């Protein structure tokens, strides 16, 4: 029916968000996101090496902190770290249908 519904599942490590399209409880999954409480997953470089050729971007800021982004197909990985830590780590994964 074109209506989006969101389902949140909270875990010790973070939140899993499932987006569906269609009637409530009978829709098709269109998007899944996992947002971790802490950016302590794999490093940006490790995921980049694993994924291979992809759209990538990094920014380093002494004030706002550091950020990285990898997009391969319909999968997106986001990374972050504190301003003094140049080793950015995974904190979010998005999968799209």
Give a label for each model feature.
Residues 1-25, 38-97:
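A cross-family detector of function-defining hotspots
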């Amino acid at each position: 029916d074109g209506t989006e519904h969101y389902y949140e599942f909270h875990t010790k490590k973070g939140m899993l968000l499932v987006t569906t399209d269609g009637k409530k409880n009978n829709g098709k999954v269109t998007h899944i996101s996992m947002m971790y409480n802490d950016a302590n997953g794999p490093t940006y470089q490790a995921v980049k090496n694993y994924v291979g050729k992809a759209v990538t971007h990094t920014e380093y800021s002494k004030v706002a902190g550091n950020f990285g982004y990898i997009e391969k197909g319909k999968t997106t990985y986001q990374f972050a770290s504190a301003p003094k830590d140049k080793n950015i780590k995974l904190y979010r994964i998005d999968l799209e249908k």
